[in-house]
């Protein structure tokens, strides 16, 4: 089938924002204006098309990123909706991996918020070109210019206004387009009746000032334009737009525009901005991967290249079962064909291919290079896996996901629910790589772990709603870790003689504290331990490290150097060396000044001035470490690092301290040593 839209007419982009900045409403409006939605869905009523899981509709937040295709002025737009709540940053990370550009939505009265920073850092990591849309210009306290300043200060980004608002708060009527130097005024509620005219007289000076700053910023990114600009020549609209597009794609400029999605003002201009300034698949570097020989290989975005695609999300649909959201990077993915899942080394049959529109589906015969869609019928594919042709295997860059920081015990209310719960949990773990589930060896309880309390609340909610499993839930537990403070040497000998063949393994190790992942170095010389037994020592140590000596938590940040040992011709075996390895590890840890580590959260608390002292006192009582304070719109913002164990139930405490006016956001930051007194308390509880 011939391609309907050439590659340069594609825009794969995401919409990212802090919770409540109006991201879902903005996406809704894009779907409305691009003709895919006849009635606008409102998030307040729980009727929005992008938020299609029942929990999202109740809570009014977006949890699952859905990829939606729509069309605008001869362009195909694929919108990847990303959640703005910090517990779901993995979804954001995952969407950023497959999109080419992004629109960051800011709330006009709050500017840059904590989650905006998190998402911005993730977008920096993947080098995603972006533009900023300052939403809610009609809200009380809206301040466009303050927003631009917060972007420059807190995100260290070169934000350049290409529009300025005409009126704000309830007087917001439209905007001045600084490129064309014209006013755009909205005359009706649906944003269909637009009047373009002269810049209002009272705004002329401000428009002139911001237009001059914009032209200078654009000229600075292009030598030819800079020369013309310095010689005092007028730069044409076309020259400015071409240079601005290039500068945005190169991450040199972040264009800033404004609007009110809820009031239908400025959304069409934002879609025009996506087309004008965000990259097509041809504007970004070709995707890299490794072939089976471990050599780097590049795949160009072209239908003629060998097929390669990345499954970036697995979801369970009540009607068709398992959907694998996929982006095709090169070649053509055809329904009914066989492909190789190169990450797992398994063949897969492509059942049906569908393009998603929020919650409805359109079946297609094929997905071409740069297209996004969902594959039905894949058995072994999970998030982050590569699909490719067998003739030209490639593994695209693997996605990395953070480890969970909080866990709870969960049990079904009825015996019959046990098996149902097991199946449901494994399905949910397949969809979400930051959600883990296992059985506690000591208590036999089922444990679920995730990125925060809301994350686990939603998992329990889905168990009840989608899988009809009623559960009892235990109190949240912190994912402590253990580590060592000094390098030590230790040895262990495992020798057993009980009639017939004995067991013999003996090893000497050095255990060294590090900052990174576990490392095992084989420093045996002269065959003190035969080569075939070395992996057994490593495995013994890995297993022993799952349960440290303080309170049985996993041990991290250490390196093992195996430097000596001995063996017996007859009695030595892999099992004996595995046991010797785990004994040596325990002996080493006992001498190495072991400490308990706890997850420390980066917390940002927003409170009215009068509650400041009270809230800071409370932060200190929670072992918090103050990082700084700002004021924004008459509210104080307190930034601190607080141990996760002290944050349970904080929402309620903050509400009662501030009469419901305080809010907070937190995200995992790092692990740190637990004070001695608390270490003893944790160990005492665990070892009871």
UniProtKB/Swiss-Prot annotation:
Transmembrane segments annotated in the record for this chain: none
Intracellular or extracellular location(s): Cytoplasm
CDD domains on file: EF-G, EFG_III, EFG_mtEFG1_IV, EFG_mtEFG_C, EFG_mtEFG_II
Phylogenetic lineage: Bacteria, Bacillati, Bacillota, Clostridia, Eubacteriales
Organism of origin: Clostridium perfringens (strain 13 / Type A)
Residues binding GTP, per UniProt: 17-24, 81-85, 135-138
Residue ranges constituting the tr-type G domain according to the UniProt record: 8-282
GO-annotated molecular function: GTP binding; GTPase activity; translation elongation factor activity
Family, as annotated: Belongs to the TRAFAC class translation factor GTPase superfamily. Classic translation factor GTPase family. EF-G/EF-2 subfamily.
This protein's name: Elongation factor G
Listed HAMAP family: EF_G_EF_2_B
Family matches, as InterPro entries: EF-G-like_DII, EFG_II, EFG_III, EFG_III/V, EFG_IV, EFG_V, EFG_V-like, G_TR_CS
Known function: Catalyzes the GTP-dependent ribosomal translocation step during translation elongation. During this step, the ribosome changes from the pre-translocational (PRE) to the post-translocational (POST) state as the newly formed A-site-bound peptidyl-tRNA and P-site-bound deacylated tRNA move to the P and E sites, respectively. Catalyzes the coordinated movement of the two tRNA molecules, the mRNA and conformational changes in the ribosome.
Keyword list, A-Z: Cytoplasm, Elongation factor, GTP-binding, Nucleotide-binding, Protein biosynthesis
One CC-aspect GO term: cytoplasm
GO biological process: ribosome disassembly
Keyword Transport: no
Main location: cytoplasm
Organism superkingdom: Bacteria
């Amino acid at each position: 089938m011939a391609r309907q839209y050439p590659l340069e007419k594609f825009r794969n982009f995401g919409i990212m924002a802090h919770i409540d900045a109006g991201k879902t409403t903005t996406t809704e409006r894009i779907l409305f204006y691009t003709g895919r939605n006849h009635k606008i869905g409102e998030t307040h009523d729980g009727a929005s098309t992008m938020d299609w899981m029942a929990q999202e509709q109740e809570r009014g937040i977006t949890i699952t990123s859905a990829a939606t295709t729509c069309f605008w002025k001869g362009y195909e737009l694929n919108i990847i909706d990303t959640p703005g709540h910090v517990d779901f940053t993995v979804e954001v990370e995952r969407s950023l991996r497959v999109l080419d550009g992004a629109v960051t939505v800011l709330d006009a009265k709050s500017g840059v918020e904590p989650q905006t920073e998190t998402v911005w850092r993730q977008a920096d990591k993947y080098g995603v070109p972006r533009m900023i849309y300052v939403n809610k210009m009609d809200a009380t306290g809206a301040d466009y210019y303050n927003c631009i300043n917060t972007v420059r200060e807190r995100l260290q980004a070169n934000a350049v206004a290409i529009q300025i608002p005409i009126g704000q708060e309830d007087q917001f009527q439209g905007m001045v387009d600084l490129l064309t130097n014209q006013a755009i005024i909205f005359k009706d509620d649906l944003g269909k009746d637009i009047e373009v005219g002269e810049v209002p007289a009272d705004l002329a000076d401000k428009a002139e000032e911001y237009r001059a700053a914009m032209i200078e910023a654009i000229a600075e990114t292009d030598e030819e334009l800079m020369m013309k600009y310095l010689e005092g020549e007028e730069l044409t609209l076309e020259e400015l737009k071409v240079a601005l597009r290039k500068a945005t794609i190169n991450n040199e400029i972040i264009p800033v525009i404004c609007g009110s999605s809820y009031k239908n003002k400025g959304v069409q201009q934002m879609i025009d901005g996506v087309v004008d300034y965000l990259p097509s698949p041809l504007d970004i570097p070709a995707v890299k991967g490794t072939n089976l020989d471990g050599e780097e290989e590049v795949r160009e975005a072209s239908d003629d290249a060998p097929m390669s695609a990345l499954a970036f999300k697995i979801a369970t649909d009540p009607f068709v079962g398992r959907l694998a959201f996929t982006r095709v990077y090169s070649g053509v993915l055809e329904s009914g064909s066989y492909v190789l899942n190169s990450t797992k080394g398994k063949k897969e049959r492509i059942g049906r291919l569908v393009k998603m529109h929020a919650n409805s589906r359109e079946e297609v015969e094929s997905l071409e290079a740069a297209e996004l869609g969902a594959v039905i019928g894949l058995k072994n594919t999970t998030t982050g896996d590569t699909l490719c042709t067998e003739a030209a295997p490639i593994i695209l860059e693997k996605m990395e996901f953070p480890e969970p920081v909080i866990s709870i015990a969960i049990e079904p209310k009825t015996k019959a629910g046990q098996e149902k719960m097991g199946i449901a949990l494994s399905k949910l773990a397949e969809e979400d790589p930051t959600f883990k589930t296992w059985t506690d060896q000591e208590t036999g309880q089922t444990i679920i772990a995730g990125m925060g309390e809301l994350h686990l609340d939603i998992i329990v909610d889905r168990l009840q709603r989608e899988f009809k499993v009623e559960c009892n839930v235990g109190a949240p537990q912190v994912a402590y870790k253990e580590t060592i403070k000094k390098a030590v040497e230790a040895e262990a000998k495992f020798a057993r003689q009980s009639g017939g063949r004995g067991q013999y393994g003996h090893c000497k190790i050095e255990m060294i504290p590090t900052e990174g992942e576990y490392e095992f170095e084989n420093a045996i010389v002269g065959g003190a331990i035969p080569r075939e037994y070395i992996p057994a020592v490593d495995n013994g140590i890995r297993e022993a490290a799952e349960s440290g000596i303080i309170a049985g938590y996993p041990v991290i940040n250490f390196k093992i150097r195996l430097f000596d040992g001995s063996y017996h011709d007859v009695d030595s075996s892999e099992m004996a060396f595995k046991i010797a390895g785990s004994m040596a590890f325990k002996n080493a840890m006992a001498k190495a000044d072991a400490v308990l580590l706890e997850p420390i959260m980066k917390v940002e608390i927003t409170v009215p001035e009068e509650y400041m002292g009270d809230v800071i006192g409370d932060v200190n009582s929670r072992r918090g470490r103050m990082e700084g304070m700002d004021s924004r719109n008459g509210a104080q913002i307190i930034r601190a690092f607080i141990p996760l164990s002290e944050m349970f139930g904080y929402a309620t405490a903050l509400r009662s301290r501030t009469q419901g006016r305080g809010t907070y956001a937190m995200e995992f930051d790092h692990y740190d040593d637990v004070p001695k007194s608390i270490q003893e308390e944790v160990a005492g509880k665990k070892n009871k």
